[in-house]
Amino acid sequence: MFFLVGILIFGYYTGSFSFSFVNNLQMADGAVPFIAADAAKAVAAGGFILPTALVLMFIGGAGKSAMFPLHIWLPDAMEGPTPVSALIHAATMVVAGVFQIARLFPLWIEYAGGHMSIVVWVGVFTAFYAAAVACAQTDIKRVLAFSTISQIAFMMVALGVCLPGHDGHIIDHHGSLGYMASMFHLFTHAMFKACLFLGAGCIIHAVHSNEMSAMGGLRKYMPITHATFLISCLAIAGIPFFSGFSSKDEIITACFAYSPVVGWIMTGVAAMTAFYMFRLYYGIFWGTENKELHAHHTPHEGPWTMTFPLIFLCLITVGVGIYTTLGGFLNWGGSFGSFVTANGTDYTIHFDLQIALTSTIIAIISICLATYIYKNDEQPIADKLYKTFPRLHRAAYKRFYMDEVYQYVTHKIIFRCISTPIAWFDRHVIDGTFDFIAWGSNEAGESIRPWQSGDVRHYAVWFITGAIALTLVLLAI
């Protein structure tokens, strides 16, 4: 609803629903006016109307991209087949909200720059929340689901921290860092997250369960899936020479340029990402093998139709990672900017060595921590942590009770406090009014029914009486 209202407001005040006029707002120096039709009206209203329309469309995009608190649909949507999740949840459908913000980004910078903080903090909170929930999940699909939410929030934050140009309006080459980082992470995330989802499908196919407790020790049964899953985990953790390294560090660099607070929060979320992904990795491929379950069905590698896509996606992940990592160190530049800007402006990706080293060291520490806790067959440290912080662990496992909050809001507030009075009003007032009209009509009919006796003599008497009465009235007048 918010998205539709935003579109209608946007179209009314701009005179078009097309993106083509947005592209006329060049994301570089010397920008042209963005309105082609009815320019005076739209520009005059731009101080309030256009930012309102953009924020409304952002709310719709936030629901599409599973931003908090509109995220609860995505984990349940993961019940579908993993190839579907790999295609529409990792690469296309769920990132549509981010892409919508990116397509309208010239307008955000020009007319709603003050509202960009909404995008930033919604994304920051969503990224942290989803990463915290992923650390406690035991269902492989749900770990990847909340990982997807967190990574999409990374993209949203990157758009929000994009800095305007020196004139305070149009984005310039320095301010393009967040925009470029967001679109580049959308590109790299599609590869390694699709590989993770397809790998999860191979694992579920092998053990017939989504639960990590049914897994463990699968590396000796599924070597290809093990290798590709490990590479994808390294990519999402942001390790150098894998595709996620450059895009993640670009986002963190843009965050530090916007605010050190945002930068450190997102660095912490990146560390949490490395931790929960390797918690998942060790829980599946290392740890204690479930011999009781495997006695009934020995795990096995999938056919080549299942493993070939994993290998293909991993090759792309590694290839892009090597190219972008070496490009960052050697300052190769590249043409990715012209690929993601509507007018072909070639923005280069900025590489900050200090931030890259810091985030990489933190990611490696997180991986080592996950290795120390979860690699061994026995996991006394993990058990001790669960027993030390049972309420925190349960809250994270229960998604911090967001489902219960929605249940309470819908049943106790919407249904009981809003829907019930409306139903009473409809049943007693609306229906009662029409029932009263029907009852009155029926009573009136019953009262005049004796007049229609079917006796001609009665009709003659009434006719003569009426004629006399009418004559007297006319004579009196």
Question: What residue spans do the PLM features occupy?
Answer:
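...captures the hydrophobic TM-helix bundle architecture rather than a specific catalytic motif
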Residues: M1-G328, D346-Q379, R394-F400, E404, ...
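Short, charged cytosolic
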Residues: C195-L196, F425-A438
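Membrane-proximal cytoplasmic C-terminal regulatory module of class A 7TM GPCRs
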Residues: F329-A342
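C-terminal, low-complexity/hydrophilic appendages and adjacent surface loops
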Residues: S335, Y374-H393
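A short, ordered amphipathic alpha-helix with a cationic face
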Residues: I381-Y386, Q407, T433-I437
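Short, non-transmembrane cytosolic segments of multipass membrane proteins
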Residues: T388-H393, Y408-D426
